């Protein structure tokens, strides 16, 4: 084998040493970070344009018109179609192709850059709306399957680039708040989508599919994605409020070096510990979508797309602030974060099992909030708990991984692996729920069993979380405040 170049070897060594995650690693003093004095002296929009806050807002806008619209369609149950099976198959293809890209997402994002990776993803946003429109109105099902596969390939770029930015752009002390803001903006798109769904479909009290015109409005929103992506600043030009830059060490690594570094990340203990939690974190999407489609009316499903994100937005903002509270150590906050979603989700699985026993597996139930509000609320509440606390699951995993983050390049690799695990779970979930002959209680049972496997992984992972944030970061903040 040829000898590694200096940049390759140093990058690989960094991965092998920095990420062993000794709880006291972050207590070691590091070199004083480079502060951009010109940025601190600047004022007005030019300063704001390069700020972390503006980058988070832009990522929120991209998510608003991209993944958020996809969620609004998915939250209808079965993509808003009359049965869930075609939409679940399309979503399966979306996440299978996405998992292939995210697996190598770290090297790809490191070579292309966060900004242009996001731009590539935004170009495929309109394909989703057009696919559902043609399927709902003209029955062109093959097109839906093709475009969701293409969208999955490009969405993989956004999954890795946005998550990498969320973990490395903000200062450690503000990361939870920015994660909450980003998640809230994603759900704001789902709120808009939910309002559109409900206004168009609120008169439809029976089972079936939503009005095809719904998808045209979504398509129009998706067409704006590339604008927000082009406004992003390159990572090297992003500045935190104290004038520091995101750590860009390990630059100019060759493709061979990137793949070697990715392999080093894949062998780390934290990568394997996060596999099951990441696989589980989005698994509920297919399971809950099928539950909603089988047992609720079109009006109830449209209402759900509005209720779920409206509840989620304040929840993720509060959750983000909780993750940033300095009165507790990072590890204590990680324990609190775990309990906040594990307990309600475990209870919801039991509740959903009882509801399936009452409702059976037919598609003729059509529970409706107007015709029978009490029975609708009783069956809908566990669904709502699963979806809203599901965002807490994802935020807590992002935040925990952020405590291990060192530089943008290495974080992109670990994030790529994390999102590959996540999309793999989503693909399996929607794949199980795309089989019309399979009892829908089987995917629910698989989902419930996964939470039992999540617990030991999360317990071990949290024990590796550093007790304190970097001391230099603490001293730097004090100097800036002074």
Name the predicted role of every residue range.
Residues 115-116, 201-220, 330-337, 431-453:
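A membrane-interface helix-boundary motif in multi-pass transporters
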Residues 72-76, 131-132, 155-171, 197, ...:
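Intracellular juxtamembrane helix-capping segments at the cytosolic ends
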Residues 52, 69, 73, 232, ...:
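Membrane-interfacial loop- and helix-cap regions that link adjacent transmembrane helices
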Residues 85, 116-132, 333-352:
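Structural signature of the two symmetry-related core transmembrane helices
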Residues 91, 97-99, 151-158, 173-210, ...:
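Glycine-rich segments within core transmembrane alpha-helices of 12-TM secondary carriers
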Residues 181-183, 211-232, 339-348, 443-463:
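Symmetry-related core transmembrane helices of the 12-TM Major Facilitator Superfamily/SLC fold
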Residues 100-142:
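Conserved MFS/SLC helix-loop-helix module at the cytosolic interface between two early adjacent transmembrane helices
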Residues 1-46, 238-255, 466-482:
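Intrinsically disordered, low-complexity terminal tails of fungal membrane proteins
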């Amino acid at each position: 084998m040829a000898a590694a170049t200096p940049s390759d070897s140093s990058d690989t060594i960094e991965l092998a040493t920095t990420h062993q995650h000794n709880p006291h690693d972050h207590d070691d003093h590091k070199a004083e970070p480079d502060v951009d004095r010109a940025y601190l002296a600047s004022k007005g929009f030019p300063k704001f344009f390069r700020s972390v806050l503006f980058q988070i807002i832009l990522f929120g806008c991209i998510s608003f018109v991209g993944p958020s619209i996809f969620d609004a369609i998915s939250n209808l149950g079965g993509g808003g179609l009359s049965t869930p099976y075609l939409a679940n198959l399309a979503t399966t293809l979306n996440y299978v192709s996405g998992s292939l890209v995210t697996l190598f997402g770290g090297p790809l994002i490191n070579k292309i850059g966060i900004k242009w990776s996001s731009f590539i993803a935004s170009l495929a946003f309109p394909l989703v709306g057009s696919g559902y429109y043609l399927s709902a109105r003209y029955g062109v099902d093959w097109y839906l399957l093709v475009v969701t596969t293409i969208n999955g390939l490009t969405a993989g770029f956004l999954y890795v680039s946005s998550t990498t930015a969320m973990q490395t752009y903000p200062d450690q002390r503000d990361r939870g708040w920015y994660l909450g803001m980003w998640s809230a903006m994603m759900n704001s798109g789902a709120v808009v989508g939910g309002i559109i769904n409900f206004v168009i479909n609120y008169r439809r009290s029976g089972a079936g599919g939503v009005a095809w015109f719904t998808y045209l409005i979504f398509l129009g929103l998706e067409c704006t994605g590339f604008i927000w992506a082009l406004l992003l600043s390159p990572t090297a030009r992003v500045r935190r409020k104290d004038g520091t830059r995101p750590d860009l060490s390990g630059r100019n690594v060759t493709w061979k070096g990137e793949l070697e570094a990715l392999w080093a990340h894949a062998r780390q203990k934290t990568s394997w510990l996060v596999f099951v939690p990441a696989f589980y974190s989005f698994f509920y999407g297919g399971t809950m979508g099928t539950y909603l489609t089988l047992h609720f009316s079109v009006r109830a499903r449209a209402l759900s797309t509005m209720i779920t994100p409206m509840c989620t937005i304040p929840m993720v903002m509060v959750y983000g602030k909780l993750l940033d509270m300095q009165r507790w150590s990072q590890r204590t906050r990680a324990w609190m974060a775990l309990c906040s979603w594990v307990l309600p989700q475990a209870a919801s699985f039991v509740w959903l099992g009882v509801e399936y026993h009452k409702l059976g597996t037919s598609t003729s139930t059509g529970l409706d909030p107007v015709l029978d509000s009490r029975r609708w609320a009783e069956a809908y509440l566990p669904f709502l708990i699963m979806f809203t606390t599901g965002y807490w699951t994802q935020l807590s995993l992002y935040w925990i991984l952020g405590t291990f983050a060192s530089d943008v390049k290495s974080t992109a690799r670990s994030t790529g692996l994390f999102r590959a695990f996540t999309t793999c779970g989503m693909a399996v979930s929607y794949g199980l729920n795309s089989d019309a002959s399979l009892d829908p209680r089987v995917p629910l049972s698989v989902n419930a069993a996964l939470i039992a496997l999540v617990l030991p992984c999360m317990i071990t992972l949290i024990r590796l979380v550093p007790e304190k944030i970097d001391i230099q970061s603490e001293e730097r903040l004090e100097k800036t405040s002074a």
